[in-house]
Amino acid sequence: MIPTERGLQQVLEWGRSLTGFADEHAAEAVRGGQYILQRIHPSLRDTSARTGRDPQDETLIVAFYRELALLFWLDDCNDLDLIAPEQLAAVEQALGQGVPCALPGFEGCAVLRASLAALAYDRRDYAQLLDDTRCYCAALRAGHAQAAGAAERWSYAEYLHNGIDSIAYANVFCCLSLLWGLDMATLRARPAFRQVLRLISAIGRLQNDLHGRDKDRSAGEADNAAILLLERYPAMPVVEFLNDELAGHTRMLHRVMAEERFPAPWGPLIEAMAAIRAHYYQTSTSRYRSDAAGGGQHAPA
């Protein structure tokens, strides 16, 4: 693993070309990226004989960190209005199509997409990453409109359906596959793998919302399952319900993982993402702090 400070500086250097990009976006991307890569490093080392992709390759690691930072930045562009609506629309189009942004101030988008296209072990992963980016951006827009009261109020089922895309786990996995040859494009053809993706993404969304519910409430944020349910059902034991939901999704995930055998590093990777609340959210000193002094809560893992 490359030294933290060197990785951070490379993400910050790239992020300077994005209007509204903050140090926090880079710091959380490096912290989260390190957690994931450390958990799957032994498996990546084993697969490198097949792929030729070194888990210690600095170029690959920095590209992964930058994609994570991009996801954090996009989330805040929606939640915090970091850029104007017309700028965000242009950015989303550029990232989803893999073309330069039509407006100035966002050169980093094209730089990152060109880098990932060149680094792709399997070109199918790059095409899928563009599609996942479009889904992520659409989910962020829908969640923002819902929280602002600009659309008909969602049910819990509708919220969770959108939250599976807005947590961006598919983007994270696809980027890892693109960089280290994890064959996600082939695995997506298996119904059990698609079920695992939905389950781990639902788990991530529930963990994120449970961890951030107090801060979101104090900030007047409505895009949270706990807050949505309390608004509809004031007497409902919301935390208990969501913890039961989380436990149920986790049991279903474990059953599928026990029945299916996915190639390395997918087992350790899914386990790492399932444990992210304790090892990432709860250790945050900035974005995911559980007190009201911290930052926003809706960025991806």
Curated annotation (Swiss-Prot):
Gene3D superfamilies: Farnesyl Diphosphate Synthase. It holds the Pfam family Terpene_syn_C_2. It comes from the Bacteria. It comes from Sinorhizobium fredii (strain NBRC 101917 / NGR234). This is Uncharacterized protein y4kS. InterPro entries: Isoprenoid_synthase_dom_sf (IPR008949). SUPFAM superfamilies: Terpenoid synthases. Keywords: Plasmid.
